[in-house]
Amino acid sequence: QHLPFQHALELVRKSSIFTTHTPVPAGHDKFSENLMRAYFAHIPEALDISWDEFMDLGRVKRTDEKFSVTHLAIKTSVYVNAVSKIHQDVTREMFKDLYRGFFNSELFIDYVTNAVHPKTWMCGDWQKAFLSVAGNEFFEHMHENHDYWKFIDKLKPLSIWKLKTYQKHELYDKLVERLAKEMPQRQELPNQIIHTLEELNKTPEILTIGFARRFATYKRAHLIFIDLKRLASIVNNPQYPVRFIFSGKAHPSDKAGEDLIKRIIEVSRMPEFIGKIIFVENYDTELAKLLLKGVDVWLNTPTRPLEASGTSGMKAVMNGTLNFSVLDGWWAEGYVPGGGWALRQENTYDDPNLQDQLDAEMIYSTIEDEIVPSFYERDIEGVPQKWIEMIKNAYFHIAPHFITKRMLLEYDNKFYKQLFEYYKTLSDNDYQNLFKFISWKRKIYRNWDEIKLENIEMFDSSKRHLPLGDKFYVKLLLDLKELKPDDVIIELIFGKKEEGRIVDIEFAKTFDFVGCEGSKSKYECTIPMEQSGVYNFSIRLRPQHPLLA
């Protein structure tokens, strides 16, 4: 298309969305200027820009700051989205320096919570069960009509329990098969291998808690091992035993993640935990599906607020497996009482070690006081009625909100349609609107620092208080230089103050353009005072254009 760089950049930006998937630093690569020169020294010349202009695409300020790939993505995308509501707040805080002059709540960093594809992740037995009571149209309509999920109520509790028990037996059969090969390969002692396999063969019906995912340190796989004595009493309860099954992989360069796996295997070899703490190697999609449908509880213990979304718990819900997780990521939106268990959203301690100890204590107590009784309390048919009700609640109230069709529609309605309109507008008529828009932006840059406040008239609260019901007013006279009144928007902003600083906008009102005084532009803003108190306010001037975003 042979567009100049700034024009091409604008066209790319107006047709791009950047989805950020993690707040963890490892997910946001940064490179030194020397390293960038080694690989990209030829790029600026090809783009007809300077080296500093190229580097500025990945920096907040022109300093010795490293080149951030994430900053590059944000600067070259008109929309940015996180993958859960909490992740949106975290992302806004992370990248606020890229949006000078705006509060976090104003930043156009939106969110679309992740979701999963039910037909891919719901096991065949559950699919058949739903189709048997909801009809063949279940998968077609379960997104827009959540009542389809309530058809599970037509399944008898005994049928649900038999289905779930069958899935667990299938999991245990596969585990025995895999561990019989894996344990000798990792040089486990013969008596430990025999004891572990015997335990799995004879006790597949015990409460089974699964933890399987990437072993990053923020996932806190170590949490339940903080108090081994307490853990031993839980897993070895003579009447109500519990088994934990772990699986996952660490990144080859993540030494801390590898150490977590080593610790789990180390604990699993202790006499009191043989057969009760299991680590399964070679985690893959096949094993993930077995665990998701076969365990009773899906455990997730991330460090707050580093769980951008998480999807394994959604997949667990699709298979009648109950979640026990920190209220972070998707679970902060999905959790309903009676549909799983939760650790509170906020940290209690600034010290991560103390927070880990508290969370571990809460996990132990929740397992002992809530999860174990709900699982082991049975009726005359041997069915845990309370547990079955929780499975139903999870299907009723959680599963319908985390389906890929919902996610795709949100992306389409929030972003894709507007991106199409932007691109069409800018590219029509051989890019005429694009060239006009770039010319307008250059005019803004050329004149912005020259705008002059000629006069300001406003109510003087230092002389007298403004009675309730009266109007607070501000009148401005501006010299906009080459700019027109339509090129700018002026706002009267009232700030929310916490601990001596303005942290957010309480409310804002746009000034009205009321005419010209010679070559100067006149603006007015009036606001009725409906509440008493001390107000912190400011005036903000910013560019405006239909294509500015």
Label for each model-derived stretch:
Residues 1-549:
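Catalytic cores of carbohydrate-active enzymes across secretory and cytosolic contexts
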